[in-house]
Structure formats: structure tokens, C-alpha cells
Curated annotation (Swiss-Prot):
SUPFAM superfamilies: Class I glutamine amidotransferase-like. GO terms for cellular component: cytoplasm. PROSITE patterns: GATASE_TYPE_1 (PS51273). It comes from Vibrio vulnificus (strain YJ016). Its EC number is 4.3.2.10, 3.5.1.2. The lineage of its organism: Bacteria, Pseudomonadati, Pseudomonadota, Gammaproteobacteria, Vibrionales. InterPro entries: Class_I_gatase-like, GATASE, Imidazole-glycPsynth_HisH. This is Imidazole glycerol phosphate synthase subunit HisH 2. It is found in: Cytoplasm.
Length: 214
């Protein structure tokens, strides 16, 4: 199975590549080239930095229409990580109101947790699972993942696979059809993070066989 990690100068691509290499024998390509993206079995959209800068980079590399064609029209599985998850939504208020990819209804807002909690939210936090038969079915007692972010995704409940508590309940992971997002960093979340990536890739294999995920 060929996995393409989208390279648009805004992501921690090597850490994600190394994490996947620990999971199994996959063909992993880090690229922003159109033909390579079209040939992928699934895509990973990483992201570190500011939302407006990321959208500008995607636009400059002429990736927005291409990715939309692959993901929305051809229904290629995609995993957005951290900022990459936020880009999947309609807009973000980071720095200035900026239009996102718009693949999932929802908007990205600054965290306002109250209770003297610090922003950015940095460190380990426990997931609250919202759905059965999801990508996180492997989790048992330990549900901790590593987060680094100042904004969160405000979206309808039906798209949420998991949330976390930080003053208020916020979105940790989403899924809409072939589109999956993880606000935490699976590549930095040790065993749980590797298993989250493995679960996503196993789900991709199921999609390739034409079997829907419950």
C-alpha cells in the first residue's frame, strides 16, 4: 500500500514517516507532486504552524484543487494531523479569518478553557471516546495522547470520534466518510499513537477491499 505524506513545508513529515516505518512494511513517499499524490492509496496531511500560512502554502503549490479532487471526488482516504486536521474544516480564526479546505463542516477557534488553564495546551491528555466501532476501539484503560495546540475544532457532534477535557470538552479526533483527523500528535504519543496510525491504515485496507467501516 502506498502512503503519500503531503509535503508543503508546514509539517513534521519525517517524524510521521518514522512512526509508520515502525508499524509495518508500507511504501511511504513524502511529496507534493501531483502525479505522486494521484497514485497514492491514502494521504496524510501533517501540519505545524499557523493556519493562514498553511493554506497559503497549499495554494502556492496548487494543491487545494488537486487534494479536493482526490479526497472529495475520488474519495481517497486522508488523515489530517494537528494543524492538518484543522485544515479539513471550513475556516479558522487564527490570526485572521481564513478559509479552510471545507471538507468537513465546522470552524477552528481559539481555545478559551478558563479556570486559569494555560494556552497553548501542551502535554498529555486522555481521550473521551464518542463512538463504538471506531478507529479507537483498541484503547483500553490508557487513553492518553500528546497535544500541542492553541486552537480547537468546533464541529457537529456526529463527526467526533473522540474529545478531551481542558476546561471544556473539545474535539480530539473526527471522521467524515473517508476523511479522518487527529488533533493530537500520534507520532509523539508513543504506543497509543502508533496504534492510532495502525488503526487508520488497517481501516484504509478495509476500504480498498470495498467493505465499509461500521
Amino acid at each position: 500500500m502506498k502512503i503519500v505524506i503531503i509535503d508543503y513545508d508546514m509539517g513534521n513529515v519525517r517524524s510521521i514517516e518514522n512512526a509508520i516505518n515502525h508499524i509495518g512494511d508500507y511504501t511511504i513517499i513524502v511529496s507534493g507532486e501531483p502525479d505522486t499524490i494521484r497514485s497514492a492509496d491514502c494521504l496524510i496531511l501533517p501540519g505545524v504552524g499557523a493556519f493562514p500560512d498553511a493554506m497559503k502554502k497549499l495554494e502556492q503549490q496548487k494543491l487545494i484543487d488537486l487534494l479536493t479532487e482526490e479526497v472529495v471526488v475520488r474519495r481517497k482516504p486522508v488523515l489530517g494531523i494537528c494543524l492538518g486536521m484543522q485544515l479539513l474544516f471550513e475556516s479558522s480564526e487564527e490570526i485572521q479569518l481564513t478559509k479552510g479546505l471545507g471538507w468537513i463542516p465546522g470552524k477552528v477557534e481559539y481555545m478559551r478553557p478558563g479556570n486559569d488553564l494555560r494556552v497553548p495546551h501542551v502535554g498529555w491528555n486522555s481521550l473521551i471516546l464518542k463512538k463504538e466501532n471506531s478507529l479507537f476501539d483498541y484503547l483500553q484503560d490508557d487513553k492518553d495522547f500528546y497535544f500541542v495546540h492553541s486552537l480547537w475544532v468546533n464541529c457537529p457532534e456526529k463527526y467526533k470520534l473522540a474529545t478531551f477535557e481542558y476546561g471544556i470538552e473539545m474535539t480530539a479526533s473526527v471522521q467524515y466518510e473517508n476523511i479522518v483527523g487527529m488533533q493530537f500528535h500520534p507520532e509523539k504519543s508513543q504506543r497509543n499513537g502508533l496504534e492510532a496510525i495502525r488503526s487508520f491504515l488497517d481501516w484504509v485496507k478495509i476500504q480498498k477491499l470495498g467493505v465499509s467501516h461500521a
